[in-house]
A protein has these predicted regions:
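Short glycine-aspartate micro-motif
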Residues: 79-83, 91, 140-144, 209-213, ...
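Short, acidic, Ser/Thr-enriched surface-loop or helix-capping motifs
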Residues: 95, 153, 223
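Glycine/GP-enriched mid-protein hinge/lid loop-to-helix segment characteristic of carbohydrate kinases
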Residues: 103-105, 112-118, 167-168, 172-301
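Glycine-rich phosphate-binding loop and adjoining helix at the ATP-binding site
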Residues: 100-208, 346-357
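ATP-binding/phosphotransfer module of carbohydrate and carboxylate kinases, centering on a glycine-rich
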Residues: 1-56, 62-66, 71-107, 111-139, ...
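Short beta-strand/turn micro-motifs composed of small residues
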Residues: 147, 213, 338
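Short, active-site-adjacent cap segments at secondary-structure transitions
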Residues: 150-153, 191-194, 219-220, 229, ...
Length: 394
């Protein structure tokens, strides 16, 4: 079998259906793929000989009767997913069946390092994760690398980032591939996390899905009509750089003015609180030796008046922006970053009210909203999933 797992279109079709609906019977594969029984049987036989599939006596997820269910063989191999940011690196090992085999993280000030130092640190971390995964069954299939900015996935180049200075046109995939001797896929945070949510958190992959990331940046990962949306230059979903209406537009690290990220992301709410504290506003935050966005959200959840005011204003802007994306894309499922929940149930409900009042009734009635779990490795998982997805394509 070739480095990819699907050297023919038929094998790719069968593998992707098994990925999405496993454990699944041959008859259900015929219904799902539109292939003939003979074509499905030949494909399954080929993939079974290569030990890419396993077959168990299970209740089929697509049929009520008990039958033999086909699934991807987790022991065939594994993928690494690595996400880096201004404050550190995280890595995860997922097998072919999306089972988590291990994870590591390191806190390091990447934001304060030079470009060459960052590249070396990321490549070295990748090598350490690979070494830590050697005991996993099968072989390492490759690495999915998740960058906090805008990327050119085709060339494996980090184009720019509002969160990392001097991070322009960096051939980071080549550096990691050379260090580890493996194929590397590069993708942005938004698309990585929507893939992570779609495969790791939802009961079944969604047909139309939005994932809203909220942290140092703000991004929107999209899956529409069953396909992940990356845009013509792989930079779709930059929700944080939507211009918001404000009388005093703040400068954004992207070079623009009035970006949502500059007014409502975690660093922005920290800055707002610091300005208010400097003007002698009362708050439980006034005695903090250092202040971060999570602390502001948690203070708001404890009904601190300053934190609550700042967070509600930020969520007003974020909720309005989310509603705009919902109006344009009409998704079935909207998943919100679990970080929103740190502000407490009352402010979380305020965010939902903002989204609802700015959304068309027909769109709202069709929408299922949930909050993501607090798994810090969600982006890493999406990177590993993306790497495996690429191997299932013809």
């Amino acid at each position: 079998m070739s480095p990819g797992l699907a050297p023919t279109r038929t094998l790719s079709t069968v593998l992707r259906a098994i990925r999405d609906f496993s454990p699944v019977s041959r008859s259900a594969l015929v219904k799902e793929t539109g292939l003939t029984h003979a074509a499905v049987s030949r494909a399954v036989a080929t993939l079974s000989r290569e030990e890419i599939l396993v077959e168990r006596r299970l209740a089929d997820t697509m049929e009520p009767r008990r039958t033999r269910g086909l699934a991807l063989n987790g022991d065939y191999g594994y993928a690494l997913g690595i996400e880096y940011s201004a404050v550190g690196l995280r890595g995860i090992t997922l097998d072919l069946a999306n089972r988590r085999l291990g994870a590591i993280q390191e806190s390091v000030d990447l934001g304060g390092r030079s470009r060459s130092e960052r590249v070396s640190l990321i490549a070295d971390f990748s090598a350490r994760l690979l070494e830590a995964s050697r005991s996993a069954p099968g072989r390492c299939l490759g690495i999915g690398l998740v960058d906090p900015g805008i990327v050119d996935s085709g060339r494996g180049v980090a184009l720019t980032s509002s969160l990392l200075d001097d991070w322009n046109d960096v051939p980071i995939s080549e550096a990691v591939s050379s260090r580890c001797g493996l194929p590397v896929r590069l993708l942005g945070t938004g698309i990585a996390k929507v893939k992570g949510v779609d495969r790791m958190e939802l009961e079944r992959p969604a047909h139309d899905l939005l994932y809203i990331e909220y942290g140092d940046g703000i991004a929107c990962g999209m899956k529409l009509n069953g396909r992940y949306v990356t845009g013509s230059t792989n930079s779709a979903g930059e929700l944080g750089h939507l211009k918001v209406v404000t009388q005093e537009p703040k400068p954004c690290r992207c070079g623009g003015l009035g970006c949502l990220e500059a007014h409502a992301a975690l660093p922005a709410i920290v800055r707002r609180c610091q300005e208010a504290l400097a003007a002698n506003s009362r708050s439980v935050l006034s005695g903090a030796a250092s202040l971060d966005g999570r602390a502001v959200l948690e203070a708001a959840s404890r009904h601190d008046l300053l934190a609550r005011l700042v967070v509600e204003e930020a969520f007003e802007m974020v909720g309005t922006a989310i509603a705009g994306v919902v109006s344009i894309t009409n998704p079935r499922v909207l998943v919100l970053d679990g970080t929103f929940g740190a502000a407490g149930d009352e402010i979380r409900d305020h965010l939902l009210r903002v989204i609802r009042r700015s959304t068309l009734p027909d769109h709202w009635s069709a929408l299922k909203i949930q909050f993501s779990g607090s798994d810090a490795y969600l982006g890493c998982a999406g990177g590993a999933v993306d790497l495996v997805d690429s191997l299932l394509e013809y």
